[in-house]
Swiss-Prot record:
Its main location: nucleus. It holds the Pfam family zf-C2H2. A zinc finger (C2H2-type) spans 377-399, 405-427, 433-455, 461-483, 489-511, 517-539. Residues 56-138 form the SCAN box domain. Residues 1-23, 31-50, 257-373 are annotated as: Disordered. Keywords: DNA-binding, Isopeptide bond, Metal-binding, Nucleus, Phosphoprotein, Repeat, Transcription, Transcription regulation, Ubl conjugation, Zinc, Zinc-finger. Residues 227-300 form the KRAB domain. This is Zinc finger protein with KRAB and SCAN domains 1. Residues 270-289, 297-352 have a biased composition (Basic and acidic residues). It comes from Pongo abelii (Sumatran orangutan). The gene is ZKSCAN1. InterPro entries: KRAB, KRAB_dom_sf, SCAN_dom, SCAN_sf, Znf_C2H2_sf, Znf_C2H2_type. May be involved in transcriptional regulation. Gene3D superfamilies: 6.10.140.140, Classic Zinc Finger, DNA breaking-rejoining enzymes. Coiled coil: none annotated.
């Protein structure tokens, strides 16, 4: 036992001494650097946080030969992984996203890896967006609608050579290629997944077979791979009156027209629903129509009472034919039997939806018994019936296509006055519907209802195929196109179809070569705002590169001390 302990102490003493000396040296260096970086001048606040790519490369390039044993190697590897993934800040989903992104970049062709290294996307979605924009840029260099798929990308990848660099690539691409071309180091086994820019083989020359193979690996021959990527990409162009709400607005307008047709059925029981679906301006218009209807009812009820009065007088002449009770029922309406506007009415006699109060005889105590409540106004085009002539007039606009209500600001016309009132809020900026939870305001009540589902977590629209739920019916419709393969949005230039209108808008910029998003620093333009945001990181890294590697190491040591 003593011999084993002595041998263990003897065998480990040199290593322990080296470890101790190494720790002391590292500690002194860290303290000196911390004093230099975090000391009296407080220059830390001006130092930007280091790029996570630096820690990732340190983790991937770590070698066992640089340690004194397996335990120290494992400990150092954990430390480097901790600095890269930062589990004290990032969630599990974010850490998984980083790992998936790294693997996704590693399976891309070499030339695309070099290009993406300039942008360093933070997620797989950002990488996909960049690749889609790359295809748009490369497609824009060709004659629109003539070249697609592998042939298009193969032609576009030729300018990746530093000598023939294309203007559609980043301004720093030439420097990256030059630095990479002169590098003589070869990647180790542990580096094969990371594929840093300094270890990726040089891109092929023009017309090489490898270039064609790379293009075929990314895009299939029938150009369907790009569509799959589009299905995974996030919806990019979302506006309050954008394409996502188009179907919902049309449906809402149709529902309003149908509600007008069902207003006043059997006495007008659906009045409350109509009041919710129409605007204040249209309500005033309806009130006038209701007043006319009420006047017509009063006239008919008065004639009915006169007829009943005469009948009662005739019946009173023959008392032997009826009992006293029957005489009272068939007699003229008295003050007790008659409900007027000044008197109190029972709940069954208030007549929802009649607009104005009017007197009713005892023989017509409920709205269901009103004889004029039938749908007497019929549409000649489709045969649909309505209880009011005003509802029929509104309905006929569907067939005639008439849009009498025009906006004075932009000239846009509408078939209903209520739709014009809602549209004018775009110009006035009025947002009367406010969320009680966060205070955010909306111009449409329907948008407020959709917003409140964010707080409640309600997702009432579920896919029958996969069970995935959505908070908006339009999102469910878009999702179901993945199962059905429907692509209703077709390009008029080249005939290519898409399952979302936003994708068609982006695709049209290939033909128009429109790039509305421009960088204010270097003047480079992009087709998407998200790509411009990623481009800004290049300028941010230029500012960060002004700091020495020692400052970045000191910052990493500071992060470690804060854990």
């Amino acid at each position: 036992m003593m011999t084993a302990e002595s041998r263990e102490a003897t065998g480990l003493s040199p290593q322990a001494a080296q470890e101790k000396d190494g720790i002391v040296i590292v500690k002194v260096e860290e303290e000196d650097e911390e004093d230099h970086m975090w000391g009296q001048d407080s220059s830390l606040q001006d130092t930007p946080p280091p790029d996570p790519e630096i820690f990732r490369q340190r983790f991937r390039r770590f070698c066992y030969q640089n340690t004194f044993g397996p335990r120290e190697a494992l400990s150092r590897l954990k430390e480097l992984c901790h600095q890269w993934l930062r589990p004290e800040i990032n969630t599990k989903e974010q850490i998984l996203e980083l790992l998936v992104l790294e693997q996704f970049l590693s399976i891309l062709p070499k030339e695309l890896q070099v290009w993406l290294q300039e942008y360093r996307p933070d997620s797989g979605e950002e990488a996909v967006t960049l690749l889609e924009d790359l295809e748009l840029d490369l497609s824009g260099q060709q004659v629109p609608g003539q070249v697609h798929g592998p042939e298009m990308l193969a032609r576009g990848m030729v300018p990746l050579d530093p000598v023939q660099e294309s203007s559609s690539f980043d301004l720093h691409h030439e420097a990256t290629q030059s630095h990479f071309k002169h590098s003589s180091r070869k990647p180790r086994l542990l580096q094969s997944r990371a594929l840093p820019a300094a270890h990726i083989p040089a891109p092929p020359h023009e017309g090489s077979p490898r270039d064609q193979a790379m293009a075929s690996a990314l895009f299939t021959a029938d150009s369907q791979a790009m569509v799959k990527i589009e299905d995974m990409a996030v919806s990019l162009i979302l506006e309050e009156w954008g394409c996502q709400n188009l179907a919902r607005r049309n449906l809402s307008r149709d529902n309003k027209q149908e509600n007008y047709g069902s207003a006043f059925p059997q006495g007008g029981e659906n009045r409350n629903e109509n009041e919710e679906s129409t605007s204040k301006a249209e309500t005033a218009e309806d009130s006038a129509s209701h007043g006319e209807t009420a006047g017509r009812f009063q006239k008919e009820f008065g004639e009915k009472r006169d007829q009943e009065g005469k009948t009662g007088e005739r019946q009173q002449k023959n008392p032997e034919e009826k009992t006293g009770k029957e005489k009272r029922d068939s007699g003229p309406a008295t003050g007790k039997d008659k409900k007027t506007i000044t008197g109190e009415r029972g709940p069954r006699e208030k007549g929802k939806g009649l607009g104005r109060s009017f007197s009713l005889s005892s023989n017509f105590t409920t709205p269901e018994e009103v004889p004029t409540g039938t749908k007497s106004h019929r549409c000649d085009e489709c045969g649909k019936c309505f209880t009011r002539s005003s509802s029929l007039i509104r309905h006929k606009i569907i067939h005639t296509g008439e849009k009498p209500y025009e906006c004075s600001e932009c000239g846009k016309a509408f078939s209903l006055n209520s739709n014009l009132v809602l549209h004018q809020r775009i110009h006035t900026g009025e947002k009367p519907h406010e969320c009680n939870e966060c205070g955010k305001a909306f111009s449409h009540s329907s948008n407020l209802i959709l917003h409140q589902r964010i707080h409640s977590g309600e997702k009432p629209y579920e896919c029958n195929e996969c069970g995935k739920a959505f908070s908006q019916s339009s999102d469910l419709t878009k999702h179901q196109r993945i199962h059905t393969g429907e692509k209703p949005y077709e390009c008029s230039e080249c005939g290519k179809a898409f399952n979302r209108n936003s994708y068609l808008i982006l695709h049209r910029r290939i033909h128009t070569r429109e790039k509305p998003y421009k960088c204010t620093k270097c003047g480079k333009a992009f087709t998407r705002s998200s790509t411009l945001t990623l481009h800004h990181r290049i300028h941010a890294r230029e500012r960060a590169s002004e700091y020495s590697p020692a400052s970045l190491d000191a910052f990493g040591a500071f992060l470690k001390s804060c854990v």
